Amino acid sequence: MNKLENLKQLLAGKFKIENFKFTHAVGDDVIEVPKEDAPALLLFLRESGQFDFLMDVCGADYPSREKRFDVVYNLFNSKDSSRLRVKAQVGEGESIGTAIPAYRGADWFEREAYDMFGIIFEGHPNLRKILTHHQFVGHPLRKDYDANNQQACTNSLPIHFNNEPGSPGDVLNDKYLPLNIGPSHTAMHGTLRVMAEMDGETIVRCNNEIGYLHRCFEKMAETHPYNQVIPYTDRLNYCSAPMNNIGYCKAVERLLGVEIPPKAQAMRVILAELSRIIDHTIAIGTGAMDLGALTSFFYMFGMREKVYGLFEKLCGARLTVSMTRIGGMAQDAPEGWFDEVLALVKEIRKGTDEMANMVIDNKIFIQRTKNVCPVSAADAIQWGYTGPMLRACGVNLDLRKAQPYYGYDALDFDVPVGTNGDIYDRYLVRFEEMRQSVRIIEQVCKNVPGGDYTIRDKGIVLPEKKDVYGNIEGLMNHFMLIIKGLRPPVGEVYDATEAANGELGFYLVSDGSANPYRLKVRPPCFAIYQSFPTVVKGAMLADAIATVASMNLIAGELDR
């Protein structure tokens, strides 16, 4: 009996399952439920131990339906690595109960669905805009909202907590000093704004605001053919851009039902692990600099620069690379490139060890990071943490092990796990992950498979230039694919990879056309940063700055 059938039997005694629809779509288990049952179902699934993680909540708009909106919950079980998608239909002007009693991390995801679609989550304690500004009119991810519509923000907001002019709610307390940090402040590591009330150097309470770098990536995806979305993914986590390319292409390929060649898989693994290394160099280097260790910053960025040199040799670009294509890679690696990678990772291993010895035993560094702003494993799961932040809390979850892809299950590497969930453990985990990435790269580079770097499906991949200019079949193939685009079958999929900051997920809906009907990104930073006010409450201001750095927040993926 499969997982879905077991779940059906379990739910039979608790719910009227004759109103539920159980399906299996592109490898995903799906339950469609009446909106009235969704909150209770989610609470039951968590409390019964079926699904401990809420990875994503999003909306989808179907204007021709009587109930035009889907509310989609993507759940994960860390014990058996199973996933479940729960869907409920909500009509215009209707509401659905909040999922916060079941999963604390639903907070910002529901606010985003409210902001983008106007879906009302009844019982949400703070249902307001999160990505668009306070003067924005409408809901941009509705199908009737024009993608070319531009709305300028001309009035600034004062420092307050409710974030909506004229709305009731918390007000500033005269006993405490109001302090605004960001969104243009070097300590914020991006366009992040923190509004705090201070009692001396202690944070009494704070609120955080995002959206300053929002450009509606998901709306742009709906207006572009599948392959043309790839450059936009570069701008998500721009510190490890190839990982975004890989995650997006992997989701589309799964919907298409194609498997890329072994050589393309190997190249993607190498690029992903190099990207993980440079992402961690930024997190460690800038974080240490915030604590006064300036040497670390220059040391780490020296390693990063050498990796960029390899990217440049492979594709001509450094930061935003667009190296992958749906079906494989954009081009093969140049001769000798894998040998250069092997030579560089030896340097990186040596440099990582030297840097770790310089930092992790440093008395000042230990005092500033150990037992500072810790997060428990239970709280991390409730918030939806993934990646190094989750593993620092003692939870051994890594998709490369839990749901292996591209041959990770055949590679020998370890998953570093912390114990205290404090700032110190977050750095220890990232240092060790750099070493493990080096191990992975060495194994793959020494055994790169032969064969092609892409599939040769004429309905998916453009022909090579020599074929376009050399024969009529290649020319016509190129013409038809450009004009009509690749067209995945009607369906939907949620696919995820282990990016540098955690689970990078793509919920993709196809209506059979050349553009995605709906593309939702699950950015790892989003779930993490929503917990910031809780994590730093009662801490010193300097510790809050160190916490921001240890979270490695990237505004590009946070705001999209």
Curated annotation (Swiss-Prot):
Positions of region (NADH dehydrogenase I subunit D): 175-560
E.C. number(s) listed in UniProt: 7.1.1.-
Signal peptide location in the record? none
Signal listed as a keyword: no
| Record flagged with keyword Translocase | yes
Its localization reads:
Cytoplasm; Cell inner membrane
Q: How does it sit in the membrane?
A: Peripheral membrane protein
Using the UniProt annotation, give all residue ranges assigned to the region (NADH dehydrogenase I subunit C).
2-157
Annotated keywords: Cell inner membrane, Cell membrane, Cytoplasm, Membrane, Multifunctional enzyme, NAD, Quinone, Translocase, Transport, Ubiquinone
What is the catalytic activity of this protein? a quinone + NADH + 5 H(+)(in) = a quinol + NAD(+) + 4 H(+)(out)
**Domain of life (superkingdom):** Bacteria
* InterPro entries per UniProt: NADH_DH_suC, NADH_Q_OxRdtase_suD, NADH_quin_OxRdtase_su_C/D-like, NADH_UbQ_OxRdtase_30kDa_su, NADH_UbQ_OxRdtase_CS, NDH-1_subunit_CD, NDH1_su_D/H, NiFe-Hase_large
Task: Output the Gene Ontology terms for molecular function.
Answer: NAD binding; NADH dehydrogenase (ubiquinone) activity; NADH:ubiquinone reductase (non-electrogenic) activity; quinone binding
Give the UniProt entry's GO cellular component terms.
Answer: cytoplasm; NADH dehydrogenase complex; plasma membrane
| Role of this protein | NDH-1 shuttles electrons from NADH, via FMN and iron-sulfur (Fe-S) centers, to quinones in the respiratory chain. The immediate electron acceptor for the enzyme in this species is believed to be ubiquinone. Couples the redox reaction to proton translocation (for every two electrons transferred, four hydrogen ions are translocated across the cytoplasmic membrane), and thus conserves the redox energy in a proton gradient.
Protein family membership: In the N-terminal section; belongs to the complex I 30 kDa subunit family. In the C-terminal section; belongs to the complex I 49 kDa subunit family.
Subunit structure of this chain's protein? NDH-1 is composed of 13 different subunits. Subunits NuoB, CD, E, F, and G constitute the peripheral sector of the complex.
Record's protein name: NADH-quinone oxidoreductase subunit C/D
The protein's organism comes out as Bdellovibrio bacteriovorus (strain ATCC 15356 / DSM 50701 / NCIMB 9529 / HD100)
The upper taxonomy is: Bacteria, Pseudomonadati, Bdellovibrionota, Bdellovibrionia, Bdellovibrionales
